């Protein structure tokens, strides 16, 4: 709540990242949806959801129901939107294949992606047409105008995954002061970053 309130006070955005899944192994979609509700109830002016797709602890083409449910909740509040989707193959690597993590980092931090779609469902259907399943969906920005977003220092970022092992690499990219595994470009270290559990492995949130 403190991070959300801080972002609201500074006219920042609340970003929610997480594995949008009913699998319950690394996360649960209900937690993401409740975080949207929480941020809206506390007065957030803008909420951006970055959906990581499963297809491993769930059937390989099962994301549509989860995305539809979350989109419905976003529409209910009018200030929330799914702004990106990407498969867990990229966003949740745990074996130092940093080229995968970099794709997720660029998508979430700056909206840089291989693909752009007008809605999350459109993005998913396009991925299926390319032969991708949920786990392997390539980085896609969701935007009707193709305008890129950037996570700012005044924003709050909440990572909703509750299992640490596959959340660490992406978290390191976001919060490490001296991150060197790939070039983050001008992306600043995020100061208002929240983990829903202790991801360990030397991660320090200042």
Which role fits each region the language model picked out?
Residues 1-206:
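…; additionally, a secondary subgroup of soluble metalloenzymes is captured
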